[in-house]
């Protein structure tokens, strides 16, 4: 039976208009089906489109640009399998659950969590450094319902990628992992970040070409942002001229920016402007984004829906920067909400 025959015709047409030109990481038919069901009230739980779910801070590497590198790391406090499943049940309206780290593949229950989410018609993504992606592991990911694997590639040059991540031979391991994932039938994108240097010397374009050579699904990129281990380094940010150059290089939909509405008529952050995205830490802290070290509650203490409503109702989300770029790129936002956090405070900082 055709999709249009299964679902309300008016809502299908609305969904097609809204999601015209989605990133290659999304299956458009599944997105339309999700949108019509969610708008039609067929799903229950908290309102969310994309949940970035940190399930561990543990990682084999220690990258200087890690966006969660300055968060408190106490493995015994990590959410249990049952606690994560409870959050997934509370997130039944979600289109995407993106398991994030640290390195998610270090959790022994990852396959169980992927299966649990996919059985609830949630689209499951996983971010990885690629170290554990063997043929057997990729098959398990596929068999349990993983839809998209993001593998980090920081540089097109093997020795530079290895240096940045502190592990010799990692580039070859990661690119081999990408090939294995694709052969297993998984969608697999290269995940990278842009810097002033890689934009100027052409390395970002070479990462895109590497993705094409590997026949990857696409490239997801992040702008250099003063967060994580870069929290006190605003000089990493691109200038407006550099951003214009980047937009000319990053040809959508093969190349897309993370966590942004991608209809190309807008560059608004999906979290701050659309309330469509948020982050949960491995310890249950609910945050607007993994880049923003502020928490509005913990799922061990309150229902997810209650925390989300409190978070999006906070006055910071009605202020000037909301309909603009990532707030962590905004000097006024950082000065008002980040630089006022008392020194020595463990992050993320509790807002209420």
Describe the function of each predicted region.
Residues 2-145:
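Conserved alpha-helical substructure of the radical SAM core
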Residues 59, 63, 284, 304:
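Conserved, mostly hydrophobic/aromatic
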């Amino acid at each position: 039976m055709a999709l249009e025959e299964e679902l309300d015709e008016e809502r299908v047409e609305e969904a097609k208009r809204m999601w015209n030109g989605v990133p290659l990481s999304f299956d458009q038919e599944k997105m339309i089906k999700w949108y019509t069901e969610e708008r039609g009230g067929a799903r229950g739980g908290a309102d969310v489109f994309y949940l970035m779910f940190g399930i561990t801070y543990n990682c084999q590497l220690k990258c200087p640009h890690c966006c969660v590198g300055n968060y408190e790391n106490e493995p015994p406090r990590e959410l249990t399998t049952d606690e994560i499943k409870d959050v997934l049940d509370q997130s039944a309206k979600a289109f995407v659950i993106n398991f994030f780290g640290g390195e998610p593949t270090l959790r022994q229950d990852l396959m169980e969590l992927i299966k649990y989410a996919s059985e609830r018609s949630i689209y499951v993504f996983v971010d990885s450094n690629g170290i554990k992606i063997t043929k057997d592991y990729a098959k398990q990911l596929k068999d349990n319902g993983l839809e998209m694997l993001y593998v980090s590639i920081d540089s097109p040059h093997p020795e530079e990628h290895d240096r940045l991540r502190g592990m010799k031979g990692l580039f070859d391991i990661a690119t081999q992992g990408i090939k294995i994932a694709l052969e297993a039938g998984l969608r697999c994108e290269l995940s990278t970040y842009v810097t002033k240097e890689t934009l100027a010397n052409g390395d970002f374009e070479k990462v895109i070409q590497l993705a094409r050579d590997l026949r990857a699904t696409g490239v997801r990129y992040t702008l250099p942002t003063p967060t994580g281990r870069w929290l006190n380094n605003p000089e990493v940010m691109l200038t407006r001229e550099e951003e214009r150059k980047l937009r000319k290089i990053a040809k959508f939909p093969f190349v897309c920016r993370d966590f942004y509405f991608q209809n190309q008529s807008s560059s608004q952050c999906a979290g701050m402007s659309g309330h469509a995205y948020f982050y949960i830490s491995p310890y249950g802290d609910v945050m607007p984004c993994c880049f923003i070290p502020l928490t509005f509650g913990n799922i061990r203490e309150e229902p997810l829906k209650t925390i989300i409503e409190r978070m999006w109702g906070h006055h910071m989300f009605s202020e000037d920067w909301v309909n603009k770029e990532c707030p962590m790129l905004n000097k006024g936002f950082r000065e008002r909400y980040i630089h006022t956090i008392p020194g020595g405070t463990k992050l993320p900082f509790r807002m209420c």
